[in-house]
From Swiss-Prot:
Pfam family, one: RNA_pol_Rpb1_2
Function statement: DNA-dependent RNA polymerase catalyzes the transcription of DNA into RNA using the four ribonucleoside triphosphates as substrates.
Organism phylogeny: Eukaryota, Sar, Alveolata, Apicomplexa, Aconoidasida
Gene encoding the protein: rpoC1
Catalytic activity, reaction form: RNA(n) + a ribonucleoside 5'-triphosphate = RNA(n+1) + diphosphate
Listed name of the protein: DNA-directed RNA polymerase subunit beta'
Compartments where located: Plastid, Apicoplast
């Protein structure tokens, strides 16, 4: 359930679903009539024509039509005058609008017996056992009809009439057989008759009387559960499934390959088996007095097991495949809730090794091209959206190519952007700072060496995480408070964090070395610009000796020096 006000989205709430709400979501209002989206047939499509079968798992009446402005009544591409005001076909009564409804329109299966939802039986709260005051093992014993499969005498093919006559004759012997025979219906009626307010008050009174720790813990759980049910307007019998919702047809599609061969999603097979068993159970219930009662019990057990496989999969098929199950979408690291709803930062973050780059300005950080292209991919797609000829797949392929125009777009994006850098473990505030990114080659983050003390980092393989601020408030905070030039002084001891590191001292020392062993091939230069030209083209190296022309009071001198001394002299002159 989505919670929102008139202005914007507030939050998301998970709740036990009301059966009436399932009918509302799956029904269509058409010409003062309500068309309910109940799936009756286990068939999916006609494999000869490739069209969905009526009242099946891909029915166009229930899940909306497949093609745009098209029907299955052999009348294609209607004139707009043939449509009603709401664009319904007059012949087959299908809705003729763009088929986006097929991705969110639900269907449902009307179950002939109420089936217990397995998450409320074996889940961490064990809701069913708390509500019914029964043990989980005993409830499993009831819903899977183990009483009839464990006792050999009930495996005999008794008729209902004979069974009830035996119950009347031997009441002591067959005392609890009714409870085991109609366990689903009896448990469902017990939950229907629960008054939540009276149960809550009774449990609170028992809590005052009881002194045992175990009983108190159990009563606390029950009181919390009843409070939750009352506050959220949940009825206890909703933990049983009267109606089984079916996912929209657009989320479990089928694809045509060739020679009348199709690929269909595995969840459709599970739904198909549930409908088959449900229809078979309906047939046995109709012929109850004329058949053996064990047939009905087998179908009830199989129906419960198939719905369990849909929720928590334990069934392995012959080809080592498994059915789709909904617990995968909520459990684990890559579940829908953890990965997509709670972990949205995963798509806008990265990690890389840091390497030294003294030529970079202290407030900047060198961001590799391959990281920046993945971080800013949604922004680049948004820029390319103005070209309507390109689809999303082609845009993403275009971005992955190292094109000059993409680099220009990236440089424009990075001009007013800040990225947050974190080094684990985050022991204090200085481990999280923001920098202005610059596009660089290679695969590592180019880091300013004097900023290492605040992060407690060095260049022996340390890794740093990259995060991209998205919201206006986080952008403002990263620009003002977290910025690197605002965190020069430590907040704990007021010391300058720009301390001279070992790397910095070694670098200055190497730039001051004058090696007289390289006396061969000493070049003569008239200007420093020419020396830099030779140095950048790898003709001269950092320790090579050179003679440079120096004029003082119209007197010409040639000074013997090295490239490294010229570099440090130039930097000292600039700064």
């Amino acid at each position: 359930m989505i919670i929102h006000n008139n202005i914007n989205f507030i939050g998301l709430k998970l709740n036990i679903l009301n059966p009436k709400q399932i009918i509302k979501w799956s029904s269509i209002f058409y010409k003062n009539k309500i068309i309910i989206g109940e799936v009756l047939i286990p068939n999916t499509i006609n494999f000869n024509t490739g069209l969905p079968i009526l009242n099946g798992l891909f029915c166009e009446k229930i899940f909306d039509y497949m093609y745009k402005w098209n029907c299955n009544c052999n009348k294609k591409m209607y004139n707009i005058n043939n449509f009603s005001f709401f664009l319904y076909c007059k012949f087959c009564k299908n809705k003729l609008i763009i088929n986006i409804n097929r991705k969110y329109k639900l269907g449902f299966i009307f179950l002939n017996i109420p089936i217990l939802h397995l998450w409320y039986l074996t889940g961490p709260l064990k809701v069913a056992s708390l509500l019914l005051n029964k043990n989980v093992f005993y409830l499993k014993f009831l819903i899977y009809y183990k009483y009839f499969f464990s006792n050999i005498k009930y495996k005999q093919y008794f008729y209902y009439n004979k069974l009830f006559s035996k119950i009347n004759l031997y009441k002591k012997k067959y005392k609890n057989i009714i409870q085991y025979l109609f366990s689903h219906n009896i448990l469902y009626k017990k939950l229907q008759n629960i008054n939540l307010l009276t149960e809550l008050l009774n449990n609170k009174e028992l809590l005052l009387i009881n002194n045992k720790y175990y009983n108190k813990k159990y009563l606390y759980k029950k009181i919390n559960l009843f409070n939750l049910f009352i506050l959220n307007n949940i009825k206890p019998n909703w933990i049983f499934l009267d109606l089984l919702p079916i996912l929209p047809a657009g989320l479990r599609p089928y694809f045509y390959i060739n020679n009348s061969t199709y690929i269909i999603s595995t969840i459709n097979e599970n739904y198909r088996l549930i409908i088959l068993k449900n229809n078979k159970l309906k047939y046995w219930l109709y012929l109850r007095n004329n058949i053996f009662f064990i047939f009905e019990i087998i179908e009830k057990r199989l129906l419960q097991q198939l719905i369990d496989y849909l929720l928590i999969n334990k069934l392995i098929l012959k080809n080592n495949n498994t059915f789709f199950n909904f617990s995968k979408t909520f459990q684990g690291k890559y579940s829908t809730i953890k990965y997509k709803l709670l972990g949205k930062r995963v798509d806008f973050s990265g990690r890389s090794v840091i390497t030294v780059n003294p030529s970079i300005i202290y407030n900047n950080i060198g961001l590799p091209y391959y990281i920046s292209i993945n971080l800013f991919k949604p922004f680049l797609i948004n820029i390319l959206k103005y070209n309507s000829k390109l689809n999303i797949i082609f845009k993403s392929l275009l971005i992955n190519k190292n094109l000059f125009i993409i680099q220009k777009f990236l440089n424009r994006l990075l001009q007013n952007q800040f990225i947050i850098i974190n080094r684990a473990p985050t022991l204090h505030r200085m481990n999280l700072q923001s920098f202005k990114p610059l596009l660089t080659e290679g695969y590592s983050l180019k880091f300013y060496p004097l900023g290492c003390t605040s992060f407690n980092a060095d260049f022996d393989g340390d890794q740093m995480s990259i995060f991209l601020p998205l919201i206006k408030t986080s952008k403002f905070e990263s620009n003002i408070n977290l910025n690197f030039d605002k965190n020069i002084i430590s907040p704990s001891n007021n010391k300058n964090l720009f301390s001279n590191l070992q790397y910095y001292k070694l670098g200055i020392n190497t730039l001051l070395i004058l090696n007289y062993n390289n006396e061969l091939n000493i070049f003569y230069f008239n200007s420093i610009e020419k020396i830099y030209e030779y140095y950048n083209n790898n003709i001269l190296f950092i320790f090579n000796l050179v003679w440079i022309k120096y004029i003082n009071n119209n007197n010409i001198f040639y000074i013997l020096t090295s490239i490294n001394r010229i570099i440090i002299n130039l930097y000292m002159y600039i700064y």
